[in-house]
Amino acid sequence: MRLRCMIFAVTAAILFNAAAFSHHGASAYDRSNRITLKASITEFKWTNPHVYILFDALDPKGNTDHWSCESINPGMLSKQGWTRRTLNFGDKVTIIGFPAKSGSKVMLLEKLILADGKPLVPALLD
């Protein structure tokens, strides 16, 4: 019985670590295709494990697309000068990043430029 418990514990630890490791990868994004979007912020989610920036941007035909941009965690962004009040509803920004390979309106943040020209750069996800 003790051996079974030990085998179960080791197996669970291995599976948990594999799931945690795969979650923090950036493989869902096309890192070879950098895009730049002029955006209007709709929501800024300062949450763990990742901060999300929700925004509207115009497509080439002039239609509004609703996007979600993933960044790193709040602790790491804080070290780069970000706060939970860095972005607000309606702020006009330029967002540079890598789109989802799936084609959905989701991207990984590389850089954000505020309306006054100030760049905000998170530490990159590897």
Residue spans for each PLM region:
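Short, structured beta-strand/loop micro-motifs enriched in basic residues and often containing a Trp
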Residues: S71-K79
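Short aromatic-glycine-enriched beta-strand elements
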Residues: T47-L58
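OB-fold/S1-family single-stranded nucleic acid-binding modules
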Residues: A100-L124
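Positively charged n-region of N-terminal signal peptides that target proteins for export
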Residues: M1-C5
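Bacterial N-terminal signal peptides
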Residues: I7-A19
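Conserved hydrophobic positions within beta-strands
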Residues: L37-I41
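Short nucleic-acid-contacting surface segments enriched for D/E, G, S/T with interspersed K/R
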Residues: S78-I95
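Short boundary/loop segments of OB/S1/cold-shock single-stranded nucleic-acid-binding domains
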Residues: A20-I35
